[in-house]
Amino acid sequence: MEDVVIAGIAGKLPESENLQEFWEKLLNGVDMVTEDDRRWKPGMYGLPKRNGKLKDISKFDASFFGVHPKQAHTMDPQLRLLLEVSYEAILDGGINPATLRGTDTGVWVGASGSEAGEAFSQDPEQLLGYSMIGCQRAMFANRISYFYDFKGPSLSIDTACSSSLMALENAYKAIRNGRCSAAVVGGVNLLLKPNTSVQFMKLGMLSPDGACKVFDASGDGYCRSEAVVVVLLTKKSMAKRIYATIVNAGSNTDGFKEQGVTFPSGDMQRQLVSSLHRECGIKPGDIEYVETHGTGTKVGDPQEVNGLADLFCQCEREPLLIGSTKSNMGHPEPASGLAALAKVVLSLEHGL
């Protein structure tokens, strides 16, 4: 069975207009989490004053993407960003998007909501109907397929923080199983209103000072953040550029837990990774680095680290390096998996 590879990648992350800027900030240890009023007044409703924000989400080349001005003004900025960054990802793979028209290319997008849709729908007398088309999560994938004339599967996935990696898994398996020859996989998250943050704060999930102190004793919650990342997956024979090969992908869920539905299970994470490695012949000692979920919460970090230690550190080996993008840029929730993947791909590309 032919290998599936990452053939192109593009993204916008906090204070980073593209992946080159993102990489430079990672290398220089720049804190991409900021305190300003680009979304709402810092400290409103007692919220943490800092979060991770994209530089500018106000502009969109509507005519280029075949979007009528009336539609563009009521289209979720998340979808506008996905259209733009998907184009960049395909070009990054050395492919002219026009050559993919009519092909079985699929689209999978990880996203968890549309705060813009709620805002655009507040006044029934002002509704034009376009916000329903521009803000439905189904359209996050379908509009991409429509613009490029892709004929493969097209769907949006919401599994909260794992959404974009679930999208990646589904796309990978679709290519492996012959449902499509290539796939555009995206993850997106924007913070457009304070209400969602207030709910997370009330649940005790947010760091009061707006920082993900990953794997640190001072960890007291996570910092919310924005991101949009898109990768192009293809069969190896189709790729003009190869960043990395995906050797396996899978998922499970924790089931019932006494501590509640939001409590993570390090044991289930360990079981999943162990089974995936066993399927493709990877030994624990072969792994040199793990890019973790690592959000800086008092509950999640210990569960994850203990699971990794049980899996990878029960044999003689060199030290296992671990890390998390969230200590640099905050937690972009449904887009976090692809943001982490971007960091790893960039590290490989630069020989680190």
Swiss-Prot record:
GO cellular component: cytoplasm
Class of enzymatic activity (EC top level): transferase
Induction entry: By triiodothyronine.
CDD domains: PKS
GO biological process: fatty acid biosynthetic process
Top-level taxon of the source organism: Eukaryota
Entry EC number(s): 2.3.1.85
InterPro entries attached to this UniProt entry: Ketoacyl_synth_AS, Ketoacyl_synth_C, Ketoacyl_synth_N, PKS_Beta-ketoAc_synthase_dom, PKS_NRPS_Biosynth_Enz, Thiolase-like
Task performed by this protein: Fatty acid synthetase catalyzes the formation of long-chain fatty acids from acetyl-CoA, malonyl-CoA and NADPH. This multifunctional protein has 7 catalytic activities as an acyl carrier protein.
Assembly and oligomerization: Homodimer which monomers are arranged in a head to tail fashion.
Name the UniProt record assigns to this protein: Fatty acid synthase
Gene: FASN
